[in-house]
Amino acid sequence: MKPLKILISNDDGVFAEGIRTLAIAAASRGHEVTVVCPDQERSATGHGLTLQAPIRAERADELFNEGIQAWGCSGTPADCVKLALNELLKEKPDLILSGINHGPNLGTDIFCSGTVAAALEGTLEGIPSLAVSIASFQWRKFKLAGELALNIAENAINQKWPKKLLLNLNIPPCDSEQMGKPGWTRLSIRQYQEQFSKRKDPRGNAYYWLAGEAVKDLESAGDGPKEWPSDVSQIETNSPSLTPIQPDLFWRGNVNDLPKLN
């Protein structure tokens, strides 16, 4: 295929190994790669935007291979994509990639994910966009994930990427010999046991650390072929999960179940 203009962002920051691996893999295929991502980790910021402070962007080419233009941005992941599309890039990219995230973005966790938000910003602008994550916080072998993400994105572009489609790719933490084939999945519904750790600062004032863990993954009752597994169950089989997402959050239940308006 002809070289693509690719914008890459993330929420783990400009120093993260995942984004560096993805950018280098894309450039090695002959694509024109630009990185615009947070200057430090900004995980779990969702689609937040910076409105009460200026946004600064500094060149960070030295962190990547020759030929890759890079900026570290003081804003959120969504800020980074907005800034890139409206100020930093001379031309609209053909593709936006977000990741490789250092940890999973499965099920309803996507609503908190800065990685998914960066890709969603591209989808809202009508640009083919894919978020890619390793489904483990400890796994640090990113090369296979980068190649798989590029294969899927290039294939989707060759087949004419549907409008308003965001692809969310999660990759199991295993080597290629143990990994199954990628498959289409539905979003699971993740339920957490939320916990706050209450502490006191040196002046005796209380503060809190949020901690929690997923205690239940429910099958979604929403749209999607029923034969598709959930993204969580797909990962549990050591197979990459690919979930099609759209920005339209309109409720699709029975309108007769809605509360009556006075």
UniProtKB/Swiss-Prot annotation:
Alphabetical UniProt keywords: Cytoplasm, Hydrolase, Metal-binding, Nucleotide-binding
Name of the featured protein: 5'-nucleotidase SurE
Cofactor(s) needed by this chain: a divalent metal cation
Coiled-coil intervals, chain numbering: none
Organism whose genome encodes this protein: Prochlorococcus marinus (strain SARG / CCMP1375 / SS120)
SUPFAM superfamilies, A to Z: SurE-like
Family: Belongs to the SurE nucleotidase family.
Catalytic activity: a ribonucleoside 5'-phosphate + H2O = a ribonucleoside + phosphate
Gene3D superfamilies: Survival protein SurE-like phosphatase/nucleotidase (3.40.1210.10)
MF terms in GO: 3'-nucleotidase activity; 5'-nucleotidase activity; exopolyphosphatase activity; metal ion binding; nucleotide binding
Biased composition (Basic and acidic residues): 220-229
Name of the gene: surE
EC number: 3.1.3.5
Region entry Disordered, spans: 220-246
Cofactor note: Binds 1 divalent metal cation per subunit.
HAMAP family assigned to the protein according to its UniProt record, in alphabetical order: SurE
One Pfam family it belongs to: SurE
Keyword Transferase among UniProt keywords: no
Function noted in UniProt: Nucleotidase that shows phosphatase activity on nucleoside 5'-monophosphates.
Family annotation (InterPro entries): SurE (IPR030048), SurE-like_Pase/nucleotidase (IPR002828), SurE-like_sf (IPR036523)
Subcellular localization(s) per the UniProt record: Cytoplasm
Compositional bias (Polar residues): 231-244
One Gene Ontology cellular component annotation held by this UniProt entry: cytoplasm
Ligand binding (a divalent metal cation): 11-12, 43, 101
